[in-house]
């Protein structure tokens, strides 16, 4: 609905013409109530299943090397959730405390971050050399490692779990030895825009 400032104050504030003019001249204010923001949910990892059969079957079906799966599972960075049997990719802080979890359905296309996850800590591995490989999804990281297995633990990898650049920027700040960044994002609109933000 169009109109001038007086019309807006009359409509929005329920004022008469004279009252609206007073408001605009600074002689009266409109008290706006602040909308309550819901408090952020605490971050809780989904409960672990007693085994990882479905996650192994899913990832092996994606041609991920068994040793790569075992490597991340052994370090508590990958597990199967007890309720939905999703693959859960865990991102930890420098002290080994989980701060982020990304779920990938083992049946169907479900993907999502656990409520309360901090994007800066998404699924990653920090190696000793100076190269950081940046991906959109954790499965992309595992696929790349499977295709390029030579001395892979020496490199660093991060899955943005979307295209927010926060995780890559956090790693570069926390680990100054990382000097070379290789963007391995999808060639779609989201990947191209995410890559532009990282440049």
Question: PLM features: residue spans?
Answer:
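Short, aromatic/basic amphipathic alpha-helical patches
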Residues: 171-174, 193-199
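Acidic, metal-coordinating catalytic cores used for nucleic-acid/nucleotide bond scission
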Residues: 162-166, 185-195
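Secondary-structure boundary elements
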Residues: 61-68, 92-97
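Phosphate-handling DNA/RNA-contact segment within nucleic-acid enzymes
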Residues: 79-174
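Non-catalytic accessory segments of DNA primases and related replication-initiation nucleases
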Residues: 1-61
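Acidic beta-strand-to-loop metal/phosphate-binding motif
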Residues: 134, 178-190
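Short, basic/aromatic recognition patches
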Residues: 65-82
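Phosphate- and divalent-cation-binding pockets in alpha/beta enzyme and binding domains
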Residues: 8, 143-144, 193-197
């Amino acid at each position: 609905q169009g109109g001038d400032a007086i019309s807006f104050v009359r409509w929005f504030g329920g004022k008469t013409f004279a009252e609206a003019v007073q408001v605009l001249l600074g002689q009266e204010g409109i008290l706006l109530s602040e909308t309550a923001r819901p408090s952020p949910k605490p971050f809780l990892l989904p409960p672990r299943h007693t085994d990882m059969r479905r996650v192994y079957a899913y990832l092996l079906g994606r041609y991920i090397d068994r040793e790569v799966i075992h490597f991340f599972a052994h370090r508590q960075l990958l597990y199967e959730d007890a309720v939905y049997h999703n693959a859960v990719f865990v991102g930890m802080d420098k002290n080994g405390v989980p701060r982020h979890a990304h779920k990938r359905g083992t049946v169907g296309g479900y993907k999502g971050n656990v409520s309360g996850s901090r994007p800066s800590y998404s699924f990653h591995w920090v190696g000793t050399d100076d190269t950081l490989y940046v991906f959109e999804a954790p499965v992309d990281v595992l696929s790349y490692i499977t295709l390029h297995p030579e001395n892979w633990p020496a490199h660093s990898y991060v899955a943005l779990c979307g295209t927010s650049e926060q995780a890559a920027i956090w790693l570069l700040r926390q680990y100054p030895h990382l000097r070379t960044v290789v963007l391995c994002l999808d060639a779609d609109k989201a990947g191209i825009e995410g890559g532009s933000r990282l440049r």
